[in-house]
Structure formats: C-alpha cells, structure tokens
C-alpha cells in the first residue's frame, strides 16, 4: 500500500486520530475528511482541523447538517441526556453509511481507492453501523454504485480500547492521542469529562493498557 493514496474519515477523536497515524505509515499520500453534521460541539471540528494541520494532512470539511433534520439523538440535541440503552441515543441513524458514501465520492474525485475509518466491532457500543458485516456490505455497494474499486480499511475493527491504545503506542502516537484528541461527548479534550460513555470506554482501555505498558 506504500504507493497508494488514502482518505481518512476523521473526527479528531482517539480512534480516527490513531487511524490517521496508521494511514500515514501505510500510504504514500493521505488526506482527511471531517463531517459537520450538527454535532453538539463545534470543538470536534476545530480539534480535527488542528490535528490535520499539525500532521501536515490536507483536510476537507463537508456539511451534513441535514442529518439533524432527519434524526433525533443525543449527539445533535443538547436537550437530550445521553443514555446507555441497547442502541444508545448517541447513535445517529445513517451516520457511518452517509459518511462513507460521501467519502467515497470524494475519494474517487481525488483518485484514491482506500477509505480509512475507525469503526470497531469489539467495542462498538451498540452502534449497528460499526459492525464488520455492515462495512463489507457497504464496500461492495459503493464499488457497484460507482464502478470503482474502493477498499474500506478498518484497522481498529477487531481491537478493543486497550489494544487501540497499544496500536497508538506502536505508531509513536500514544502521548499525542492521549493529550490532543477529543472523544468526550461533552466536548472536553484529552482525558475528557470522565462521566459520559465515550470517556468511560476510553479511560477503561487506557487504564488496562497502562497496567501492562513497558
């Protein structure tokens, strides 16, 4: 893959930033795309901008604010409290489907075949569009829809959060990911608020990894 180019679906969070570091080692040229979909915190987009600039990665921002007109969830609605149901109310219907579809359109225009996303089935938090089955199905659909050989790369698919921290460390990005990324649903950079489901998952993985880190 060293002579190929890739587009990373990028939010500025732990997972997508780890994927960005991974992609920079795997591909000859990497760009990133971030989607503005009416998320609770503009900070997510600002963090993504800053990280892309610091890593010298060309960065695109696409407006998908129409998602807020179609679905009600705790990631786009400030008046909804975050819950932990079987499918949490932080799940945005169609989000990864749309993100990857728009990323594919952009990738084709840029002459790229690889699309990198940080979805993960091991710690998928009840989100159906993070499952390997969905990604493989969408990959086939996109190839047929655009008659173009896309490859959706999912380097975190079978890693839990402990293993994701280990990968960041292998990539030389452990401290950067720990201090600079925004995973928190409440918009707190780095270690986060410590209370939301995303922060708890991130911290549990970090604690588990630091216990065995050499």
From Swiss-Prot:
Family designation: Belongs to the QueC family.
Gene Ontology BP terms: queuosine biosynthetic process
Record note on quaternary structure: Homodimer.
Organism phylogeny: Bacteria, Bacillati, Bacillota, Bacilli, Bacillales
Residues binding ATP, per UniProt: 10-20
Co-factor note (free text): Binds 1 zinc ion per subunit.
Protein name per the record: 7-cyano-7-deazaguanine synthase
Pathways involved: Purine metabolism; 7-cyano-7-deazaguanine biosynthesis
GO molecular function, a single term: ligase activity, forming carbon-nitrogen bonds
Binding-site list for Zn(2+): 184, 193, 196, 199
Function (record text): Catalyzes the ATP-dependent conversion of 7-carboxy-7-deazaguanine (CDG) to 7-cyano-7-deazaguanine (preQ(0)).
Cofactors that this protein relies on: Zn(2+)
Domain of life of the source: Bacteria
A Pfam family matched in the record: QueC
Keyword tags: ATP-binding, Ligase, Metal-binding, Nucleotide-binding, Queuosine biosynthesis, Zinc
EC number annotated for this UniProt entry: 6.3.4.20
Catalysed reactions listed for this entry: 7-carboxy-7-deazaguanine + NH4(+) + ATP = 7-cyano-7-deazaguanine + ADP + phosphate + H2O + H(+)
